[in-house]
Swiss-Prot record:
UniProt record similarity statement: Belongs to the XseA family.
Subcellular location: Cytoplasm
Pfam families in alphabetical order: Exonuc_VII_L, tRNA_anti_2
GO molecular function, one term: nucleic acid binding
Species this protein is from: Alkaliphilus oremlandii (strain OhILAs) (Clostridium oremlandii (strain OhILAs))
Catalysed reactions listed for this entry: Exonucleolytic cleavage in either 5'- to 3'- or 3'- to 5'-direction to yield nucleoside 5'-phosphates
Name the UniProt record assigns to this protein: Exodeoxyribonuclease 7 large subunit
One of the GO BP terms on file: DNA catabolic process
Coiled coil region boundaries: none
Domain of life: Bacteria
High-level lineage: Bacteria, Bacillati, Bacillota, Clostridia, Peptostreptococcales
UniProt function note: Bidirectionally degrades single-stranded DNA into large acid-insoluble oligonucleotides, which are then degraded further into small acid-soluble oligonucleotides.
Amino acid sequence: MQIKALSVSEVNQYMKRILGSDPILSHIYVKGEISNYRLHSSGHMYFTLKDKNSKISCVMFKGNCEKLKFFPEEGMSLVCKGYVSIYEKDGQVQLYVNDMEPSGIGALHLAFQQLKDRLNKEGLFDTKYKQEIPLIPRRIALITSPTGAAIRDMVSIILRRFPQVELCIFPVLVQGEGAVETIVKAIELCNRYPGIDLAIVGRGGGSIEELWAFNEEKVARAIFNSRVPIISAVGHETDFTISDFVADLRAATPSSAAELAVPNRVELREYIDSMEKRMIHLMKTKLNTSYQKLSFIENSYFFRYPLNPIYDKQQYINDLLQKIKSAINVKKQFNHRHLKYLGERLHSLSPLSIFSRGYSIVRNSEGSIVKSTDHVQVDERLCIDVIDGEINCKVIECKKEEKILGKY
């Protein structure tokens, strides 16, 4: 009997039918560590799931990827739900993943931590971006479910504490499909609505799945971008959501948010009365101090004799002028005496002053001063300068004598 040969395509198609009809492989959970993770531009996810002995190729299509609450990462331990089949084109056996969860920790808890870390790094939780909650808001927006207990509690508490405030209710879905979109739209509408001073975004308690809308990135960014200050009031005191971290103020419960949003009317009245009394006391103290200062000024020397300081300054200026004149006279007298002394010194050092003491100067015919008998000859004509003129004479005889130093 001749056995019919099958084509490669037929073999792969047969194997695919076998795998698809297997009750275990058609609906299976596989645990392993993710590696070779790659998110394709088409939106499909490709990776390998492995343990210490084996590995299997995995694919997760775009539609299923978009349902994930967390981002798979290289080396993460996962439990993948799906079915085993064969890729006919190359005959490769693959695990087609429909859903996955981190091993040992819930997907929602991991998604919460991943988003929290990412937004924190971006600075969305930074206190420098927190807006101040108004002390007495005139109009408050309540963004919550219109039918839950939270809205009844908030309205009751706010109107009891401060009935003058105006409440604007923006009804939204707080859980399930469409909740994120309605919350984001309500926050955006609240920012366009005129006169809104404050908004409370929240709901009552519930499981993490029921509170999850307030952990979504779109809601967090809408709260961060709001120009209206927002109080986050989600769940009970032990519940924390991403909205709590990004809001301008976190309240443990919706009831607490209502108390934080408005002051107590009675307490506010008491506070205003006490401030009024304190202000009156301060004003009286200030007036008394001012009266005392005014009285002191009225009795002061300057106030009673306002021109005396001017007279004192005038006398001071006159004294200075006298001192200046006296100093100038003293300087003039000193300079006069000094000048006279210098003149006398100059006169005593003048060559002409020797004539007054009986001396004369002898010059030869060339006008040179004769200092020695060696400088003249017999019959040479000389000119003798005296105090009142000159004498012309003729040398008859030259006698040389040795003079003793200091004789004359």
